[in-house]
Regions:
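A conserved hydrophobic helix/loop-capping motif in glycosyltransferases and polysaccharide synthases
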Residues: 46-55, 62, 69, 81-82, ...
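Conserved catalytic core of nucleotide-sugar-dependent glycosyltransferases
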Residues: 130, 143-144, 161-249, 432-478
């Protein structure tokens, strides 16, 4: 037996490596491949709860906003219920669910065809105890379904709320709060939160509300009440104790769904928050109990016109909507003045006019920025010596001259075509609530009183004569 020392082993190893090809490579550990990064996490699972009653007027735009949420549809479940309808809500919601269900993770549908009203209600806008009771049961059923399906969040959105910010879901989740509402805006100070609450659970005025509602203070604020639209994080342990129905055993406030839920949150130790860091959407001002579905529809039209000012909203593409009826309200023409380069305003105004049921005649405005001195001279336009704007004290700008020429071209058409009565709208007009009804009432009053008029500024309600030294037939509607 031959003994080989350590030195011999050291010499033998290179010799073996040279004599046996591949020996060294088989024994040496290969270099590790580059490690691939981990993939991103899937978005949390969300259930959106839709409870609709007599909402055929609002569903197309409401569902259009749901469609355009910037969130993976396969991570969203839809829970939808409707009941006690006198309009087309059930058929419309069913049509949307059938068409859209393939893009969502899961859809649950709870229609109730009959009865069409509650036995103890005065009308469709009245809230008797039976209606509150039924609504709370529906919302509790939605909450139960979300928990059973292991949803991470549930989003409650009233069927007349317009979520115009597509990122609202992501933004609210990023706040990392158990119960949070995006602040919604309306034509008044009304919104979907309270800053104060009385010992009896009713709304209480506080100095904190208006600065938040008017975006003078920005952030997320603890409040005693949120309603209409809010996001609940079901991953939080405290969320297990939240309930819409039945009311908490210690509950003694009025029988009202939002008050019952606010009390439940208080007892569960869940703080409600409202956020106004961005503009998230709109909601209509509530109507009175004696008002009708038609009043509600008219009220919602104004919500649409306000939303269209800064947002490009559309009805849901999953619904077939017959063309809306448009008319000129008895005017020979409704002229809409628009600068050709302001396509954004033209698009907004045409959508607004469609929602109002008005048929406009588009008129290209004279662009004051394109006017020069030689063009004005060629048109025979001269500034009156010493004239200054009565409000600003300055001479007229080219833009104001262009505005005048735009109107002048319409007046010329009136004479040439022998038009008797026209309405002129500029593309930055903002409509008042119930615009058509109020304008029709004004025109009826004028006809009844046989008012001799040439020009009126619109709106609003009661006529007040403008004192001018040269013209007696000009009125401003105030």
């Amino acid at each position: 037996m031959v003994a080989v020392g350590v030195a011999g082993v050291a010499l033998l190893w290179p010799l073996l490596a040279a004599l046996v090809p591949g020996c060294a490579s088989d024994l040496v550990t290969p270099v590790q491949e580059q490690v691939k990064p981990e993939s991103s996490l899937l978005r949390p699972k969300v259930m959106i709860a839709i409870v609709a009653r007599n909402a055929a007027h609002s569903l197309p735009y409401y569902l259009g906003c749901i469609d355009r949420l910037d969130y993976p549809k396969e991570r969203i479940a839809i829970w939808a219920a409707t009941d006690h309808n006198v309009d087309n809500t059930t058929a419309m919601l069913r049509e949307w669910l059938k068409s859209a269900q393939h893009v969502y993770h899961y859809v649950e549908w709870r229609p109730m065809e009959e009865p069409r009203s509650y036995t103890d209600e005065w009308g469709p806008k009245h809230w008797p105890p039976s209606r509150f009771n039924h609504l709370m049961k529906l919302r509790q059923a939605a909450l139960k379904a979300a928990r059973e399906r292991w949803a991470d969040y549930i989003l409650f959105v009233d069927s007349d709320n317009l979520l115009t910010n597509p990122r609202v879901l992501k933004l609210m989740m990023a706040e990392n709060l158990t119960l949070v509402a995006p602040m919604l805006e309306s034509r008044s100070l009304y919104s979907n939160f309270w800053c104060g609450i009385t010992p009896q659970g009713y709304y209480k005025r506080t100095p904190d509300y208006q600065p938040i509602r008017e975006w003078k203070r920005l952030g997320c604020f603890p409040v005693p009440m949120v309603h209409s639209t809010f996001l609940l994080d079901l991953r939080r342990e405290s969320s297990r104790d939240l309930a819409f129905y039945p009311p908490h055993p210690d509950y003694s406030w009025a029988f009202d769904d939002i008050m019952v839920f606010a009390f439940s949150a208080r007892q569960a130790g869940v703080q409600m928050y409202v956020c106004n860091r961005e503009h998230y959407g709109f909601l209509p001002v509530p109507l009175k109990a004696q008002q009708s579905v038609e009043d509600e529809s008219e009220n919602f039209i104004h919500t649409i016109t306000e939303a269209l000012i800064d947002h490009d909203i559309e009805p849901s593409g999953h619904l077939y909507l017959s063309p809306s009826l448009q008319d000129t309200m008895g005017f020979d023409e409704i002229f809409l003045i628009n600068l050709k380069r302001r396509l954004d305003r033209r698009t907004r105004m045409l959508k607004t006019m469609t929602s109002l049921g008005l048929q406009p005649t588009l008129t290209n405005a004279v662009d004051g920025k394109a006017l020069n001195t030689s063009q004005l001279q060629a048109l025979g336009i001269e500034m009156m010596p010493g004239y200054k704007d009565p409000y600003s004290g300055r001479v007229l700008t080219r833009g104001e001259i262009g505005c005048f020429l735009s109107h002048h071209s319409i007046w010329t058409q009136v004479i040439e075509r022998s038009l008797q009565k026209i309405l002129i709208l500029e593309d930055d007009v903002r409509f008042e609530p119930r615009f058509k009804r109020r304008l029709q009432a004004i025109m009826d009053d004028i006809s009844r009183t046989q008012l001799n008029w040439d020009l009126m500024y619109l709106p609003p309600p009661t006529p007040k004569k403008i004192e001018t030294p040269s013209t007696s037939n000009i009125y401003r509607m105030k």
